[in-house]
Amino acid sequence: MKLHEHQSKELLKKYGLPVPEGYAAFNVKEAKEAAQALGGYPLVVKAQIHCGARGKAGGVKIVKSDEELEAFSEAILGKILKTVQCPNGKVVSRLLIEKATPIEKEFYLSITLDRSNSKILIMASKEGGMEIEELSKEKPDAIIKEYVDPVLGIMPYQTRKLSFALGLNPSLFGKIVSKLYQAYMDLDASLLEINPLVLTKDGDIVLLDAKVEIDDNAAFRHKDIEELEDITQIDPLEVEAKKYGLNYIKLEGNIGCMVNGAGLAMTTMDIIKLAGGAPANFLDVGGGASVEQIANAFRILTSDENVKAVFINIFGGILRCDRLANGLIEAAKIVNIKIPVVVRLEGTNVEEGRKLLKESGLNFESAVDMWDGAQKAIKLAQ
């Protein structure tokens, strides 16, 4: 679950972390009220969307008067802001108005989970303000990595090591890293990114930007944070899928995918790409999907106007092939299927599943294996 910058900063402020004074504004009137509350100019106005690289896309501006604030707010609120990370753009429905911070030096700092060694990874760099993806390509040696054992927690020697590598006061920076680590753990975050973290001209350290992402699997432990989620930043089909406990992520291709199991879903998308096509989504119906869930999954899948063909790839284990077939038959009663559907079934009750589909009268194309299914789906989508 992604949070807006202003929400992330409010959470981090509770841990005693230094963030600029600021207010969220949903319209021009609130933007002006925020400016008045902050005591004047210059101010920084930031578009609040769930995408990085906002500054390069014109989503961040320093304003020095009421006129500039009003003009920028009117120009960007309600508009779609496209960035490198979000080429299709996101609607700007709110702004963050902050006091401008006098910057001496910018740094990068993030905390995430490194699954390869089951440790918490802290990344830092003197190259603040750059996207970490760009930095890893252009200057990989500029990224400092420190691994933390979650059982032991972050140790004093690790905060000192990071401080010395960045050339920052160990006492001041060490406390900030420790508090950020505590916030990361308490919030069940999957990512906590500060870019940039800045050293001011007065020698203070300030979190100039903040991104917090909460692990969806732990959201039930944070009902107050769950309520902060801005569904306007999420694709409507993803919101719909979440209601039925489906793992759905919209992509840019035209081959719809329905698969059971995340690993098989990833493999299916890879095979579609290998065969020269492009998947339109990630959709894992899971092992214990009911007939109703399968029907809703198919309905959501075919609601995407970009989908020109569907590849259903099921290996029946916990999710039996006959149950999947019944779900598809139920979905066909609800959805007027106008696009080609390719089905590959293997595993538990596969013959029963194939028989049900054959006797249903549905015009589904059968595939003998994944490669055959991918090729057929791509051909039918043309």
UniProtKB/Swiss-Prot annotation:
It is an enzyme of class 6 (ligase). The keyword Metal-binding applies. GO terms for biological process: succinyl-CoA metabolic process; tricarboxylic acid cycle. Binds 1 Mg(2+) ion per subunit. Residues 9-240 form the ATP-grasp domain. Mg(2+) binds at residues 195, 209. Its cofactor is Mg(2+). Keywords: ATP-binding, Ligase, Magnesium, Metal-binding, Nucleotide-binding, Tricarboxylic acid cycle. One of its GO terms (molecular function) is succinate-CoA ligase (ADP-forming) activity. ATP binds at residues 46, 98, 101, 106. GO terms for cellular component: cytosol; succinate-CoA ligase complex. Substrate binds at residues 260, 317-319. The keyword Coiled coil does not apply. Pfam families: ATP-grasp_2, Ligase_CoA. Succinyl-CoA synthetase functions in the citric acid cycle (TCA), coupling the hydrolysis of succinyl-CoA to the synthesis of either ATP or GTP and thus represents the only step of substrate-level phosphorylation in the TCA. The beta subunit provides nucleotide specificity of the enzyme and binds the substrate succinate, while the binding sites for coenzyme A and phosphate are found in the alpha subunit. Heterotetramer of two alpha and two beta subunits. Belongs to the succinate/malate CoA ligase beta subunit family. This is Succinate--CoA ligase [ADP-forming] subunit beta. It comes from Hydrogenobaculum sp. (strain Y04AAS1). The gene is sucC.
